[in-house]
Amino acid sequence: MKNLLICIIKMYRKYISPLKRPSCRFYPTCSQYSLEAIEKYGALKGTLISIKRILKCHPFNKGGYDPVK
């Protein structure tokens, strides 16, 4: 499951992300953050942490440096 999620994120980064203008308010980007979270915590916890981060990525949030802890 972990490898499948990583593959999906990498496909998103390669094929979908270049079609959109950059809009992530954080560093590392939400997709990179998701990759790191899934690698570090596994499929379930990493996905939950990633969803929480993606929900924070909106115009009303200041953003900034937010590494996987």
From Swiss-Prot:
GO terms for cellular component: plasma membrane. Belongs to the UPF0161 family. InterPro entries: Membr_insert_effic_factor_YidD. SMART domains: Haemolytic (SM01234). This is Putative membrane protein insertion efficiency factor. Could be involved in insertion of integral membrane proteins into the membrane. Pfam families: YidD. Keywords: Cell membrane, Membrane. It is found in: Cell membrane. Its main location: membrane.
